[in-house]
Amino acid sequence: MMRQKLFDKIYGCLLGVAAGDAMGMPSSLLPADEIQRLFPEGIDSFLPAPPGHMIHDQMVAGEITDDTQQTLLLADLFLETGSFTAEGVARKLIAWADRINAFDGLYLGPSSMRALKLIKDGADISKTGLIGDTNGASMRISPVGLAHPGDLEAVVTDTAEVCKPTHNTNIAIAGAAGVASFIATALACDNLEECVDAYFYGVKAGMQRGGKWTGASIQHRTEWALKLVRSGKTEKDIWSNLYNYIGTGVATSEAVPTSLALVVMYAGDPWQVIRAAANIGGDCDTIGAIAGSMAGAFAGADGFPEHVAPKIEEVNHLGLEQYANRFVEKLVLADD
Ligand SMILES: [Mg+2]
């Protein structure tokens, strides 16, 4: 694989997480009609949180949230240790949540909050994630895709391991494995249909892992969402149908199908995808991060407008380019 191209795709994936997260930050967890009231022109650039936002009050334009922070924790784990272990994930998440006081308030999602508190109290991590079915696993999973270009079996195995402490349900693993499989395929492929096929492979394989839990089928909801985006309806009608019928909430079986649908709707153009996520309503920052991770891996960092990466770095100092370089080094070394 061309080293420069691999770098561009990995960088694009991480940039998609951060830019999607930051663009959806001001509208995060707001209903669609409330977003239209607060932002009558729509959100088509990085904006500050509206005053009094229930989670992001006072945050500035371009600022990222937990989605990007947790993604980089998983990237750190892989870059430091060369593998993903459930213990390593739990250790990283607990240290981070303690550092930023996330065990108080709404910053930490419901599955992670519940499970990490139990783990801190000494619970067995093979038990703590058995009812975790929300989208936190999918929002932070992209490093698993980045670690295994083209190797979907390894993606599914590592996804189940990463989900174990907090999201050890078939539903959460299916969503996360779908996203990570899309990314792992996009690193080595410029055909969107193949990446979508990989997503469905990951969803189906993920459903065989973890504890059994009930929820709407991610596979069937995604198929329905894809029919919707190919129906010829107007952009606004498709957004409203995704919001009302597929859903854009914190459930994995809402957020992940809608994210994949947005990627297909805009043929993998990451800026259009994350703009749609910021305006669609519901869990906008997380849908932006998930859809952005897939579109960014598909299109590469070159697929974003030029101002995006400098703005994200100026506000957040994440060093995403360095992260991408370190991934490439690790993957090229492992290949030799
Ligand atoms: Mg967030």
Question: How should each PLM-predicted stretch be described?
Answer:
Residues 1-336:
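Structured, active/binding-site neighborhoods that engage oxygen-rich ligands
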